[in-house]
Amino acid sequence: VELIGCDLASIDEAEDRDLFKRVCEGIDLPVCEAVACSSIQEVLDAADKIGKYPLLIRPAFTLGGLGGGTAFNKGELVEIASQGLLQSAIGQVLIEVSILGWQEHEYEVMRDAADNAIIVCTMENLDPMGVHTGESVVVAPQQTLSDRDHQMLRDAALKLIRRLNIKGGCNVQFAVEQS
């Protein structure tokens, strides 16, 4: 079977939380402090390294945030991370600094084999970070971003789709701290 569109490396880099973090860092896109973990002991070590709660648990290779969540203490961290490790196709979770309350903005991006790329649509989640996108009220186009911030996120989305070598469409989500 021939895979059309994205190659497997692109899919891995987009879906593996640790690889994606490194991709973003490699093209100077800011990312939250985070540690990839494959065991509960690594999760606890990551929490100690980050040093504060709440923490976000993000399983790799799952749909709809399955197995993830926000932990406000060590007990919740162990419980959520255990489920995340089970749900992840590769047994990996990313333990991340919480950005609860930040705004979530999404960009639908298309790119063809000739490297023509366009932002098809922008969306803004009316609910703050912490409410899963699938359960949030979303409006299109964005309503509250300044043009400067929109252009910055637009450029970042285009930079990312090109770096990941995605051919076709993708959804890029950003967290924006309200000033």
Feature map (PLM): residue ranges:
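N-terminal beta-alpha lobe that positions the nucleotide/phosphoryl donor
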Residues: V1-V172, V176-S179
